[in-house]
A protein has these predicted regions:
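Acidic, low-complexity intrinsically disordered regions
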Residues: 1-280
Length: 280
């Protein structure tokens, strides 16, 4: 837990910030080489502050001010996932203003069923809908990605291999006893469908969309920048640089099989073993 303020010394502040960014990047790269599942959760919160606020060349008295502070949770992504399940962000006292997480790629647990929820082993048979599309459901456990609901449920954050495969919606599974956390509705266009392997992937985001507005580069005139943190952009960017080679956070692999007979009636989707995914 920290206010994460970088105290700017005399001289070139931009050079100072960049050097701290590089220091943080190198520190995380070193630890990632030791622990391949090392992940980071960054929580931005606010608290009341009364007293003198000191910076390099001055001070200001703050009374009943609201100032940001940060909680960093660093560790194995599986441990962090269990922590999030036991202590959801929504239950943190006084609330979390902003959140972002960096993690390494995972093959997440999932199962496939048709629209009625019917499956046979790892396979489901999908009947053609009236709009010319086949639809099936994917129940996935996305908790190990450590991403918030907004990120997971944004369909624009997902990649795919085939243009005729589309995620139509993503819903949170509310049942607390469920092993799976999210339900993906997937549609396949009848006119374009082929028997192919498919991979849906949750793409890594480089940095939080709130970061620029949370950052201050000057370290003075605190009253005018009450909701900003000096240098936070460079601290978080250092972490982002350490994780930039991880383009995907999660992947869901399956095979779409179109039988030679009765292709107008049904298509088949099934989970795929990683070993032969690209050979189908």
């Amino acid at each position: 837990m920290s206010d994460c303020i970088l105290d700017i010394p005399g001289g070139d502040a931009s050079k100072f910030f960049i050097n701290r960014q590089i220091d943080i990047q190198n520190a995380f790269i070193k630890q990632l080489n030791r622990c391949k599942d090392l992940s980071v959760e960054i929580l931005r919160l606010e608290s009341s502050f009364n007293g003198w606020y000191y910076y390099a060349h001055g001070k200001e008295f703050l009374k009943d001010a609201r100032r940001p502070y940060y909680i960093w949770v660093i560790g194995n992504k599986n441990h962090l996932s269990r922590l999030n399940k036991n202590v959801p962000l929504s239950e943190i006292q006084h609330g979390v203003k902003n959140y972002f997480a960096y993690s390494t790629p995972s093959e997440i647990p999932f199962e496939i069923a048709n629209k009625a929820g019917i499956k046979k082993g790892n396979t489901c048979i999908c009947n053609l809908d009236s709009d010319g599309k086949y639809r099936f459901l994917i129940k996935a456990n996305m908790s190990v990605t450590l991403q918030d609901e907004q990120t997971i449920c944004n369909m624009g954050n997902y990649g795919k291999l085939n243009s005729f495969v589309n995620i139509e919606r993503i819903d949170r599974i509310s049942a607390k006893e469920s092993f799976y956390t999210h339900l993906l509705t997937v549609a396949i266009d009848r006119e374009s469908v082929n028997s192919v392997g498919e991979k849906l992937s949750l793409v890594s985001l480089e940095k939080p969309d709130w970061l620029e507005n949370a950052n201050d580069n000057l370290g003075r005139e605190v009253i005018k920048n009450m909701d900003k943190t000096t240098g936070i952009k460079y601290i978080i960017q250092g972490v982002a640089d350490a994780y930039k080679s991880n383009k995907e956070l999660a992947e869901i692999k399956f095979v779409i099989s179109r039988p030679l007979k009765s292709t107008h009636l049904r298509d088949i989707a099934r989970k795929q073993c990683p070993a032969d995914f690209f050979n189908k």
